[in-house]
Structures are given as structure tokens and as C-alpha cells.
């Protein structure tokens, strides 16, 4: 820092912003590691309450609509009504949706499309996030939910996001899967019990 005292003030501001961004990234990594550890060790408990799924999806779309618009990506919401209320941990399901939408935005090119979909299927609700991005190589699909695994050309984070998502969905008594064709896009889906 003493060496930087001689830099122009604009440069110092830029450097401090970079340090702050990296610090935030590291804090997120530490939080992800701690959260994943809690899930793996059975220490994470859900706070279950009635959860209006349609509202959850509308809000998730809203959180990412500006970013999608800036990237030139259509973020669509397709709901087959009526959707039942789930008995779920809303904050944890928001985390799952946010992670899936964020991943889709990172792996979808400009003028692409991301669809948030939800429908009832028997005694389950199926929620999916589907993009027409780069897709996932067939050889990588079997490992996609393992911790610290990253796929695709645009990597970021520690490779814990999808592993955390799967843990959260399983803790709700559901299951999570992926369907992808390289070069044609990816669909992550979760099946949650009513």
C-alpha cells in the first residue's frame, strides 16, 4: 500500500474496488464451503412453511431480468397453472433457482433464451431452468452434481453451486437432474413432493 500512495487517486480507487470485489468473491466461496459442509454432515435444517411456487418463480425472474436484458437474453416464465403450494424452505429454494438461473446466464450467448418452467406432475411439482446455450458434454453430465466440478468454457466459482442445489432439493425429499445436448442447451430440473 505504501508504494501505491504515489499512484493517481483514480488508480487507487480502481485498485480498491478490485480488492473489494475479490474479497466479496472469497467471502462467497467461504460461505459456500461452510454451507456445503453443513449439508453434507446433516447439520443444515430446513425452515418449512407454505411456499407459493408461482410467486417464487416470478420473483426469481424479476431478480435476473435486468441482467438478462443487458446480455440480450430472453428470460421467460412458463407456468402450467394451477400450481399447488409447497411445504418448503423458501430461502433455500430461492438459492437453488438463483444458482440455476445464474449458471444459465453465464452459459447462454446473446440473443439466447432461458425458460423457467413449472408444472404439477402427479404428487410432485416439476420446476426446470432451460437454456439454449453451449450445453454440457456427455462425458461431463454424470459428474455435474459432484462438488468442485466445473464444466463448460465459462467457469466461475468453486464448483459447489450445483452440488449445493442437489443437497437442498434432496433435503426437501425431491430429486434433481440434468438433460443436455452439447451445442443445443441444458435443462436442469427438480421434482419436489407436494
Predicted regions and their residues:
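Short alpha-helical Gxxx[C/S/T] motif in the catalytic ATP-binding
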Residues: 161, 165
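Short conserved segment of the HATPase_c
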Residues: 136-148
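Short beta-strand/loop element within the Bergerat-fold HATPase_c
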Residues: 111-123
